[in-house]
Amino acid sequence: GSGLVGSEMCIRDRNKLDADKICDQVLVNMRARVRAETTKLNIKGKLQSSNDMGSRVQKFVDCRSKDVSERELFIVEGDSALGACKQARDSSFQAIIPVRGKILNCLKAEYNKIFANDIITDLIKVLGCGVEVKSKSMKDMVAFNIDQLRWSKVIICTDADVDGFQIRTLILAMIYRLMPTLIEKGKVYIAESPLYEINSKDETWFAYNEQEKQDILSQLENSKFTIQRSKGLGENDADMMSLTTMNPATRR
């Protein structure tokens, strides 16, 4: 008889252990859901507080025009580029936002990590069109509406070097993941900034890559010339930036 009682106790203990495990798991799941819901509400609040974006988005420089069909947004690399582009722009219709620090790779990151990133939420706020989210738990975020886009052109403007290309790629990846319609509708542009400035006599040429540099130099043949490699957008003077990168009449 005692063996039977012992085995009953074993079963009861095991059942109690199982019940405790289940309770623990339920609690863990509940806490995770509460955390996710809180995160979602915080993010939603962050993104929806976009009416007065000038005061809410750090270092964003708006333009004067309210006519969306002519407004251009330049997304530039860092504070030094912000200074150069601010001087070179036409403030009537060109606005600027610098991206500061390291940009998250949005193709690899989870949504909660993406939306907790200030650089990304600032860009979403300034763009104004919301996001296209393919996640059930995030589907009631600020829904995408292209008619709410505040810009006719969104122009990514980074240095002409390897770091610049990487930053450009990460910004494009963000737009592709969160608002691919902007790319499909032809709203996203790349501003080409020159890699070299070549001067000979009273003339100036700009080369955007090595091949163009060689082509220009082969035309100069025996003439004296000076050649200067771009150190980055922040080093370019305002006239050059306007001529090569920002003025719609002369930029690429």
Model-derived segments and spans:
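Long, highly charged low-complexity segments enriched in Glu/Asp and Lys/Arg with interspersed Ser/Thr
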Residues: 15-39
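Charged C-terminal transducer/switch regions of large nucleotide-driven machines
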Residues: 57, 64, 170, 181, ...
